């Protein structure tokens, strides 16, 4: 097996990986013989980025006068060996810094011995004095340097290595070592989730945790993953949504709650779907879906400003505006707006709606209602046209089993979905708190629709325990589920969900 790696003089050469492994293993064997392989008694007092920031405006003359000694550690990413002096660049979690090593600063025999043993990818610990090179680069004149971890496998170089996307996902650790943009993406992800938590705390929401294993696959319409509890002797389901447990907590008196956690759906994999994904759900008592829209607007405005420094962000060719209130539009209004040719037609006539759908290449089923036809036209044709943050309302009650009916038009739910850059980011609604209405809808879901799981017909979405809880009284409540991974895609200008999940689901090799 061959691959491209950097040589010590920074040229790039073709190596046989097995040969390189053998060479590095021999070096490790020598370290073991000396009893210095993989030491764990080195401590650092500095991080590269902190040093660069703190001494950004300090001249070399001032640094020499200050005589600042630091200890630092990181992975070798480049080496320049010039006889009795060498420059080595190491990278830690925050950035890079250059080490300057000479046979004068270390004993000559120690210098020669160390340089021969080090390879790209090795992890070093160093102690030395800060100075600037002739080119002005902040560096460390090393008094002591130690090999902390020997890397047995050569790193791919930045030009030829990890061009295969699947390799990046399968060996994410290599992607993180080599690709600065990947590291930046996941740092932003962490900051975004942290800022979301801070925002929710400031708005008096309590973070909670609900079960990951359910005895009933409820809370959403999706295929679950099935597992088995040996002691209880029952099948259980990895949760497809935490919704019903969270609403039980609202019934119990927690009026403002949220959860950020994983959900699992045994369905397709695509650029916007991963079977294991991170979702945030928010529930607020004494509120309706319009209050949730305002909350989410403020949340995203805060996150974009604090993490990215602006409410206007770039995503691909689009400039997304989180500064102004989100557009609100019904499904019917969206059809008329994005398909101007339909404005002269009566789309409330089912025959006309069928004709429009067929003209768009949609195969219409005879059992579909008018609202279902509108919904499919929207999903198949309109969604991808919505670029700016937009709350789409007036969803049919028939596809909204947990949402409250609209008072003025009971055929529709008090529900909205948030679309940005052509994709659904969130789904929110005023919660159904009428236990008898909820029971009727559960029955329709459970006995009107069956899923085949493990070759058995399994009735879905009938949760008697939730109905009992609902009979104790759920206050007027609204909630939303937000796809965190999709949100991170927007905020990092990523175009596949795999780029924002550290270890996405892959088929085994």
Swiss-Prot record:
UniProt-listed InterPro entries: Aa-tRNA-synt_II, aa-tRNA-synth_II, aa-tRNA-synth_II/BPL/LPL, Lys-tRNA-ligase_II, Lys-tRNA-ligase_II_N, Lys-tRNA-synth_II_C, NA-bd_OB-fold, NA-bd_OB_tRNA
Any one Gene Ontology molecular-function term assigned to this protein's record: magnesium ion binding
Cofactor or coenzyme needed: Mg(2+)
Keywords: Aminoacyl-tRNA synthetase, ATP-binding, Cytoplasm, Ligase, Magnesium, Metal-binding, Nucleotide-binding, Protein biosynthesis
Chain residues that bind Mg(2+) 1: 417, 424
PANTHER family per record: LYSINE--TRNA LIGASE, CHLOROPLASTIC_MITOCHONDRIAL, LYSYL-TRNA SYNTHETASE
This protein's name: Lysine--tRNA ligase
Species this chain originates from: Blochmanniella pennsylvanica (strain BPEN)
């Amino acid at each position: 097996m061959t691959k491209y790696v950097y040589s010590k003089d920074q040229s790039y050469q073709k190596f046989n990986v097995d040969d390189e492994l053998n060479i590095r293993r021999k070096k490790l064997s020598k370290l073991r013989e000396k009893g210095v392989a993989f030491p764990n008694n080195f401590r650092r007092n500095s991080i590269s980025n902190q040093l660069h920031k703190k001494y950004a405006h300090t001249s070399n003359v001032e640094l020499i006068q200050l005589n600042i000694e630091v200890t630092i550690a990181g992975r070798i990413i480049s080496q320049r060996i010039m006889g009795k002096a060498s420059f080595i660049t190491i990278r830690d979690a925050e950035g890079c810094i250059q080490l300057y090593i000479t046979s004068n600063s270390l004993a000559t025999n120690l210098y020669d011995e160390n340089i021969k043993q080090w390879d790209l990818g090795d992890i070093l610990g160093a102690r030395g004095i800060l100075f600037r090179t002739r080119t002005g680069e902040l560096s460390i004149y090393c008094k002591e340097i130690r090999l902390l971890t020997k890397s047995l496998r050569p790193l791919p170089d930045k030009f030829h290595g990890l061009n295969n996307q699947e390799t990046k996902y399968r060996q994410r650790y290599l992607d993180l070592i080599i690709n600065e943009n990947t590291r930046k993406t996941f740092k932003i992800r962490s900051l975004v989730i942290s800022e979301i938590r801070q925002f929710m705390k400031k708005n008096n929401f309590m973070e909670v945790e609900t079960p990951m294993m359910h005895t009933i696959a409820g809370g959403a319409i999706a295929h679950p993953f099935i597992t088995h509890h040996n002691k209880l002797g029952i099948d259980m389901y990895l949760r497809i949504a935490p919704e019903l447990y969270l609403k039980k907590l609202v019934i119990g008196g927690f009026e403002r709650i949220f959860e950020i956690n994983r959900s699992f759906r045994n369905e397709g994999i695509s650029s916007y779907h991963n079977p294991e994904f991170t979702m945030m759900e928010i529930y607020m008592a004494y509120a309706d879906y319009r209050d949730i829209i305002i909350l989410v607007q403020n949340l995203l405005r805060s996150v974009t400003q604090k993490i990215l420094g602006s409410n206007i962000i770039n995503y691909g060719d689009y400039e997304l505006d989180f500064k102004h209130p989100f557009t609100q539009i019904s499904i019917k209004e969206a059809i008329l707006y994005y398909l101007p040719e339909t404005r002269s037609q009566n789309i409330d006539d089912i025959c006309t709606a069928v004709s429009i759908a067929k003209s768009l290449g949609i195969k219409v089923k005879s059992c579909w209602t008018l609202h279902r036809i509108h919904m499919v036209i929207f999903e198949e044709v309109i969604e991808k046209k919505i670029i700016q943050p937009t709350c789409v309302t007036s969803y049919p009650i028939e596809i909204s089993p947990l949402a409250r009916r609209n008072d003025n038009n009971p055929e529709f739910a008090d529900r909205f979905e948030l679309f940005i850059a052509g994709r659904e980011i969130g789904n929110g609604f005023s919660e159904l708190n009428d236990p008898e209405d909820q029971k009727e809808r559960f029955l329709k879901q459970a006995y009107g629709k069956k899923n085949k799981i493990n070759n058995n017909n399994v009735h879905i979405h009938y949760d008697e325990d939730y109905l009992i809880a609902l009979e104790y009284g759920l206050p007027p409540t609204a909630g939303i589920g937000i796809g965190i991974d999709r949100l991170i895609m927007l905020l990092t200008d990523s175009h596949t969900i795999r780029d924002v999940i550290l270890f996405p689901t892959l088929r085994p090799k």
